[in-house]
């Protein structure tokens, strides 16, 4: 929760992926507003 930018996404072990996260990953926040998701594989 509270992940809303690329810096906090990366700090939490995530990567920024447009539109939606691929299947093994789960969304933990957003990066550049809602269209870009912050995704993590664990």
From Swiss-Prot:
GO terms for biological process: cell chemotaxis; defense response to bacterium. One of its GO terms (molecular function) is chemoattractant activity. SMART domains: DEFSN (SM00048). Keywords: Antibiotic, Antimicrobial, Defensin, Disulfide bond, Secreted. It holds the Pfam family Defensin_beta. GO terms for cellular component: extracellular space. Coiled coil: none annotated. It comes from the Eukaryota. InterPro entries: Beta/alpha-defensin_C, Defensin_beta-like. Neutrophilic granules. SUPFAM superfamilies: Defensin-like. Its main location: secreted. Has bactericidal activity. Active against E.coli ML35 and S.aureus 502A. This is Beta-defensin 13.
């Amino acid at each position: 929760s509270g992940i809303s930018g690329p810096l906090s996404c990366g700090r939490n072990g995530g990567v920024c992926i447009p539109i939606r996260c691929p299947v093994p990953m789960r969304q933990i926040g957003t990066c550049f507003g809602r269209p870009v998701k912050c995704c993590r594989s664990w």
